[in-house]
């Protein structure tokens, strides 16, 4: 296992509460951001947070007081996360962007200090061909503080997984959108995490976890010449306790599931 071994067992709240999990993971993000010596008054972009405040909490921990653009295509989620950002980071300037990734470039600066995205690829796979009606169908449950997947989400994944050609086309679109984002915004840093979601690890959605992880590896291969070495990232992740829990020790704290890009 990766991470720091402990005799202490994992807190039950981490397995049942989104807010508890967000707080735990925000510490990891804060360490990664601190180790990259990013400007506290810089220009950041967060991609597809949903209603999760992990990144906002991490930015608070590093005393961030710059500008951040939040790209979230699901309008209800954007309103909720905007309220959280304004509460957590009252001194930051927050720009909400209610667009899909490929449609947001005109709303963003031509150069940014850092692009951050926590666990975006599974949702991007699910909603790539989407519209507001699909977002409502798939993600209306994200505001609840309970780890469960709704039936509409599962059914949509089943439909996608039965159409391999369509799924491969979606994967190519996702990769191209990230590469276009880098081209259009010239980020100093790009940071993405994509480990298996505990809530997706049962039933047919377990394959969505694997699909999203594979997609991260493909994106890393496109950017390999500008990536921070995994052993450096691993040293940072190893500072955190794994509680002898498989998801933490083998996935969340495993550098293979993190992409840290630095502009050459």
Question: Can you say where each PLM-predicted feature lies in the sequence?
Answer:
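Class I SAM-dependent methyltransferase Rossmann-like catalytic core
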Residues: 1-39
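Conserved class I S-adenosyl-L-methionine
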Residues: 40-51
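Conserved SAM-binding loop of SAM-dependent methyltransferases across substrates and taxa
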Residues: 51-65
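Short beta-strand element of Class I
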Residues: 65-71
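Conserved SAM/SAH-binding beta-strand->alpha-helix loop
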Residues: 74-76
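S-adenosyl-L-methionine
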Residues: 82-107
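A short SAM/SAH-binding and catalytic strip from SAM-dependent methyltransferases
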Residues: 112-169
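Class I S-adenosyl-L-methionine
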Residues: 201-264
């Amino acid at each position: 296992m990766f991470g720091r071994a402990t005799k202490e067992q994992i807190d039950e709240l981490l397995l049942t509460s989104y807010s508890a999990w967000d707080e735990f993971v925000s510490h990891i993000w804060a360490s990664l951001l601190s180790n990259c010596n990013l400007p506290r008054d810089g220009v950041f972009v967060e991609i597809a947070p949903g209603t999760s405040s992990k990144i906002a909490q991490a930015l608070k921990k590093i005393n961030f007081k710059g500008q951040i653009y939040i790209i979230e295509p699901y309008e209800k989620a954007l309103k909720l996360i905007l309220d959280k950002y304004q509460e957590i980071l009252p001194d930051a300037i927050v720009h909400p962007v209610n667009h899909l990734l490929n449609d947001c470039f005109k709303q963003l600066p031509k150069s940014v200090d850092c692009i951050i995205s926590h666990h975006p690829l599974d949702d991007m796979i699910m909603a790539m061909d989407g519209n507001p009606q699909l977002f409502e169908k798939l993600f209306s449950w994200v505001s609840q503080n309970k780890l469960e997947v709704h039936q509409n989400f599962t059914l949509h994944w089943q439909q996608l997984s039965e159409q391999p050609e369509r799924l491969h086309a979606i994967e190519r679109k996702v990769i191209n959108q990230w590469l276009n984002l880098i081209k259009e915004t010239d980020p100093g840093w790009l940071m993405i995490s994509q480990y298996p979601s505990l809530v997706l690890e049962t039933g047919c959605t377990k394959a969505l976890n694997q699909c999203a992880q594979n997609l991260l590896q493909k994106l890393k291969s496109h950017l390999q010449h500008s990536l921070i070495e995994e052993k450096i990232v691993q040293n940072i992740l190893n500072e955190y306790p794994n509680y002898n829990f498989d998801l933490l020790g083998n996935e969340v704290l495993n550098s293979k599931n993190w992409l840290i890009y630095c502009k050459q």
